Amino acid sequence: VEEIVKIKSSFNVIDTIPDVEPGKHILLIDHEDSFVHTLANYIRSCGATVKTLRHGFSESIFDDERPDLVVLSPGPGRPKDFKVPETVHACVKRNIPIFGVCLGLQGIVEAFGGELNVLDYPQHGKPSQLIVTDSNSVLFKGLPETFAVGRYHSLYANPEKLPSQLKVTAITEDEVIMGIEHQSLPIAAVQFHPESIMTLTGNIGLAIIKNVVAKYTQYDKIILNT
């Protein structure tokens, strides 16, 4: 359970981000995480409709729903426990944009051939200072160069084995990867929890979600031949 902290800030970046186009439909894949409903509410507050699906469904659901964006939720364990890499492949095949959170980032890394390592000290309910390393990042557009985020993980993306298709967009002070984006596809992810109370200052967490939702839902829905 997070400690609820009242945070005051004169900086509110959310006011600088364009609104999400009306009628956008997002699928949120639930990997058995207690934050999933909070994450869904953050996405809804951006103006999009959200349908939450528990993992384990048929791949054909993407053809039926034709979402504008798929969000991969956090969750316990490893990405393979929930077939997250397979979900990533299914979305890529259909040209569906993806946003991953925590386990979602790890699954994206593995889907493209990367590897995960285990932290020496698990970060569960721990705040860290994030450093934005890519000024052109979709996720962190208009945000400060550094800010506090809430972390809940023991696995992390091995930077030495990061696939060439992915670029690092943010790190911690000890250089743990906190943000990635695909070099050419509409795929992005964060290792921290944007919906955490610890990522609240100036509505930073909501701004990150609104950035990716506003940008990635602009893509046309194209179902590619398998």
What is each model feature region?
Residues 34, 57, 125, 157, ...:
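Short alpha-helical
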Residues 49-51, 115, 148, 167, ...:
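Conserved beta-strand segments of alpha/beta enzyme cores
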Residues 167-171, 175-226:
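C-terminal and late-domain segments of enzyme folds
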Residues 50-56, 131-132, 170-173:
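Short gly/ser/thr-rich secondary-structure transition/capping motifs
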Residues 102, 153, 193:
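Histidine-centered divalent metal-coordination motifs
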Residues 64-142, 146-148, 211:
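Cysteine-nucleophile active-site neighborhood
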Residues 1-86, 90-96, 200-226:
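N-terminal beta1-alpha1 cap of cysteine-dependent amidohydrolase-like domains
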Residues 136-185:
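Catalytic beta-strand/loop cores that center a nucleophilic Ser/Cys/Thr
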